[in-house]
Amino acid sequence: MLKNIVKMVLCAFLAATCGMASAQQGQQNPMAQPLQLMANPMTGQSYVKSGVLPNGLSYYILHNAEPKGRANFYIAQKVGSTLENPQQLGLAHFLEHMAFNGTENYPGHKMLDYLQSKSLRFGADINAYTGFDETVYNIDNVPTADAALMDSVLLVLRDWSCAITLDGKEIDEERKVIQEEWRMRNDSRTRFFTAVLPFIYQEYQYQQMPIGSMDIVMNFPYKDLRDYYHKWYRPDQQGIIIVGDFDAEAMEKKVVDLFTPIKMPENAAPRVYPNVSDNKEPIYFEYEDAEAPMTSVSIAFKQDATPFEERNTIGYWMNDVTETLVTTMIDQRLQEFSQKPECEYSNAGVYFGDYYVSKTKYAFNIDVEPKDNDIAKATSQAMEIVARACQTGFTDSELQRAKDELMSRFEARNNERNTTSNSVKARQLIRHFIDNQVLAGPEIDLQLFQMISSQLTTQVLNPMVKGLLTDTNQVIVVFMPKKEGLTMPGRKPMIAAVENAINKKYEAYKDEVITEPLIAKLPTPGKVTATKNNAALGTTEFTLSNGAKVILKTTDFKSDEIRFRCVANGGIQTVNPKDKKAVDNLSMLNTAVESSKLGNFNNTMMSKFLSGKQVAVTYNFGLVNTGLRGFSVKKDAKTMMELIYSYFTQLNPDPEQYAIDLKKTVVDMERSQNDPMKSFSDSLVNAMYGNDPRMTANTVAKVQSADYAQMLNMAKNTMANAADYTFVFVGNIDQQTLQPLLEQYIATLPSKGKASKAAKIYPVSFYTGNTTVSFDKAMATPGTTYYSFTSGPVVVDAVSDIDIELAGAVLNNMFTEIIREKEGAAYSPGAAGRLDENNKRWELISVIQTNREQQDKAFKLANEELDKILAGDITPDQFNKVKTAAINQYDIQLRNNNFWLTTILQSLRGIDTYTGHKEALQNLTLQDLQKWLKGLNRKNTVTVIMTGVPEKK
């Protein structure tokens, strides 16, 4: 790591800031202070109420006002699969499942029944995960106005801490569920990790995935699970984290009162994190899989990890900052080279982090995604770029851009400190509890970086990065598709690629500095010619002197966010499906625009230009409209306007860049043919859209047939008349600040003064009748995927939007209850209802992943439940669960900028599912829903079934 940088910078900084006072007062030499300072804990988030109970349990409680009236609850355990003995492989994860299947105060499934009756959704709000060294349970979006519910959720956490029932019957029923989870998750990436972990670790604790051995999962005696639970689920390994809109002091008292009585076991087993062995010679491992979506190379240079007790210090914080600067600069060079025709990789990047899955070993990592067959050459190219940086260092201009970028991030986080979501703040607290990571807070992060930034110079960084690429502790791993024409690179060429790059002598890098403006000369600003307000949506609409319209909605949901869209009628629906060339051009149109220059700036120059700016704008040719979308923080609103202006006025060809991006696209498409889910999704899209050529899946032949010049002209034509467009901005907008920018950059866009004549519409064809597509697919882990899509015409309004959503939610809950919990026929069966405003249709979607032996039963159950829904066969309990959840979620959505952006855009097309929505939802009765559902039927259903069969050996 870069620890020496930290010491040098802190010494320099403290000498500069403290030296005068120390000399005057005759105190100790300030140069002796940094190491002591480095070891002091970071205590920036003093507003977090935290403590350790006498039994060893830790707690962290934080008042947070966003989202309003909601709270998130977590119990984090420093417990995971590394604590299993060889007879318990998979039981840490199994125990996580059992926490939802009976506790002392909530027998059986009563916990989920109760929480769902109170608006909380299993999966979305109620969930958990198990890792190698941690298990975390969460209950999110709890309405804080419901005091009884808040107390009940605390009781759930208490039961998860010490009172999980582990009933034998429930254990046996859950075995099948976990077996289906294993089947569903055992894709090529999981198989790769299953193969690589025993090779790169000598320690058995890190040699298996947390889901474990299915032989053990299906056969372990109850006692093994209970032994693991009682041994490791104990207060000294547990942390309670609660973040939300509540009285933190009162919450702290409740936590102390409820969790203090939990007993800490006597003679508890020590919690040991296994150390990871070093290696003198390079470890090399290569793995091929017929379903692998791409070739990837991972190169790790292992390092000693910072001890846990030293991680919550200024020194550790400083180390993280310097690592971020280094990776930012190297990534910029890797990205810049990827834009060259001779580059053999599609993507490459570096990062510092845990060595694979272990917290006790750290690593500097280089990831490479080769394009074609020459894996060693792609690896060599990326390694040479990294080695050159480590050998010759960075330039002042590179470092300044990296510091500008990091400063911009710190500023944005600080600006959002009062509007950051519960989940984001909770994740920081969880990482602090489990890993002792720095808990400074955004204000201190920003203040510290402002103070030390000037001390972080190339003279400091360059000597230190020389030690990153070591001769020992190298680990090289290759993961690639198994297919004809692609061969494994082999140990010798890959080790040589790394070693030769490290030993090669390089010339210093010369950075191309961007000094010219994006826009050479701006025209005289236009004017706002008319203003009107929309009280219902809370918006202000401007008409500009060139005929363009602008809609502004000011919100306080996020302190430093502006979301943007501009749209004009058009899109795919205006392309004649019989015009093959135009259809082929659709396949690469958006890519062609993003490959092109804005003014004189190609992609590499644009990346440098945007350093230190939190802003993005992209082009989109959609189904029913065309235009731009983007976002910025407040300070970068001008840059966002410059980008908008440039798309409209100076979109210039870059055929070399397009050729590179086309090649990447073709490589990705060829690789995706290995993925069974690609075959499934292609079949689904083709069936749903009746093989409309504009909507069917892209092919290599189609994208290669696309004409770059024609596509660029097509895009320019869509932006030739600003009077066709409405520009929508939502966020923390100061109208007085934004209006001059609108007049300069939007009112001066090219315009014909009035909207263009409407283009001819060629409606996208949609399936009619009942269609079933069924096929077999060779798979390494055979499984069956089922997708059923039922739809019909409907009036588009708030009532329809609510009713179809609730119907889908009931169906989803029944799938979980019957197909997963009762029958164990699938791990995660799902259903949803949605309103398709564009086609004025309701949709009910069912998705199941199961196995060949149980597929008929699972499909039968799914269809029976769908028939019940359409017949209005819904119980009051089922209805109340989904209605309360919908109310809870809608209240949260109302404080989301993207929700309002979508609502305003829909209103432009005469679509209104907002007016009266909340009142209609609150007043909806079961009888209302049943009456509405009886108007639906199954006359239009597409079903796609892909059945896995074993691969031929």
Ranges and model annotations:
Residues 62, 67-84, 90-92, 109-159, ...:
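M16 family metallopeptidases and their MPP-like homologs
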Residues 163, 168, 175, 189, ...:
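Non-catalytic, conformational "gating/processing" segments within enzyme and secreted inhibitor domains
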Residues 23-61, 247-316, 320-331, 335, ...:
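Proteolytic maturation boundary segments
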Residues 114, 163-166, 170-171, 455-460, ...:
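Peptidyl-prolyl cis-trans isomerase
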Residues 167, 264-268, 391-399, 654, ...:
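Flexible helix-coil linker/hinge segments at domain or subdomain boundaries
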Residues 91-99, 326, 589:
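Active-site His/Glu-centered metal-binding helix of metallohydrolases
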Residues 170-237, 241-256, 263-273, 277-293:
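Hydrophobic, small-residue-rich alpha-helical packing segments that form membrane-like cores
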